Amino acid sequence: MSQGPPAVSVLQRSVDAPGNQPQSPKDDDRKVRRREKNRVAAQRSRKKQTQKADKLHEEHESLEQENSVLRREISKLKEELRHLSEVLKEHEKMCPLLLCPMNFVQLRSDPVASCLPR
């Protein structure tokens, strides 16, 4: 039975830098600083992304409310138009100006008086 290389040397090689050369404490410090800097940058990026999503959500809610207000206004205006159309229709039935045979395109001093019965 032959034994392979000891487990410690395999572990040591996986920790070592490329090329299987041991790292100096200076390299280890650089690696730790780089990882910390990367961790902080990733945290900052996630926070920024969350803030952006929150802002978009607030904007969406605001636009939904504005849309709802505008839809209610449209509904009210449609109802007002319907009502005024009915009023106009009723008025047209008895308006003496519409019944008058004179052409109102011509300028007159008092076109209403000329159509009214005397």
From Swiss-Prot:
Effect of loss of the gene: Selective loss of CD8-alpha(+) classical dendritic cells (cDCs) and CD103(+) dendritic cells, without abnormalities in other hematopoietic cell types or architecture. Dendritic cells are defective in cross-presentation, and mice lack virus-specific CD8(+) T-cell responses to West Nile virus. Mice also show reduced priming of CD8 T-cells after pulmonary Sendai virus infection, with increased pulmonary inflammation. Mice are extremely susceptible to T.gondii infection, with decreased production of interleukin-12 (IL12) and interferon-gamma.
SMART domains associated with the record: BRLZ
Keyword tags: Activator, Differentiation, DNA-binding, Nucleus, Phosphoprotein, Repressor, Transcription, Transcription regulation
Residue numbers spanned by region Leucine-zipper: 56-84
Matching InterPro entries: AP-1, bZIP, bZIP_sf
Location of region: Disordered: 1-69
GO cellular component: cytosol; nucleolus; nucleoplasm; RNA polymerase II transcription regulator complex
Gene3D superfamilies reported for this sequence: 1.20.5.170
Protein's UniProt keywords contain Phosphoprotein: yes
Biased composition (Basic and acidic residues): 51-69
Renumbered residue ranges of the record's region Basic motif: 30-55
Coiled-coil regions, chain positions: none
Location of the bZIP domain: 28-91
Compartment annotation: Nucleus
Keyword Phosphoprotein: yes
Gene Ontology BP term (one): dendritic cell differentiation
GO MF entry, a single one: RNA polymerase II cis-regulatory region sequence-specific DNA binding
Organs and tissues of expression: Highly expressed in CD8-alpha(+) classical dendritic cells (cDCs), with low to absent expression in other immune cells and non-immune tissues.
Function: AP-1 family transcription factor that controls the differentiation of CD8(+) thymic conventional dendritic cells in the immune system. Acts via the formation of a heterodimer with JUN family proteins that recognizes and binds DNA sequence 5'-TGA[CG]TCA-3' and regulates expression of target genes. Required for development of CD8-alpha(+) classical dendritic cells (cDCs) and related CD103(+) dendritic cells that cross-present antigens to CD8 T-cells and produce interleukin-12 (IL12) in response to pathogens.
Subunit composition and interactions: Heterodimer; heterodimerizes with JUN family proteins. Interacts with JUN.
Misc. remarks from the entry: The increased protection toward L.monocytogenes infection in mice lacking Batf3 suggests that CD8-alpha(+) classical dendritic cells (cDCs) and CD103(+) dendritic cells are an entry point for infection by L.monocytogenes.
UniProt protein name: Basic leucine zipper transcriptional factor ATF-like 3
Highest classification ranks of the organism: Eukaryota, Metazoa, Chordata, Craniata, Vertebrata
Gene it is expressed from: Batf3
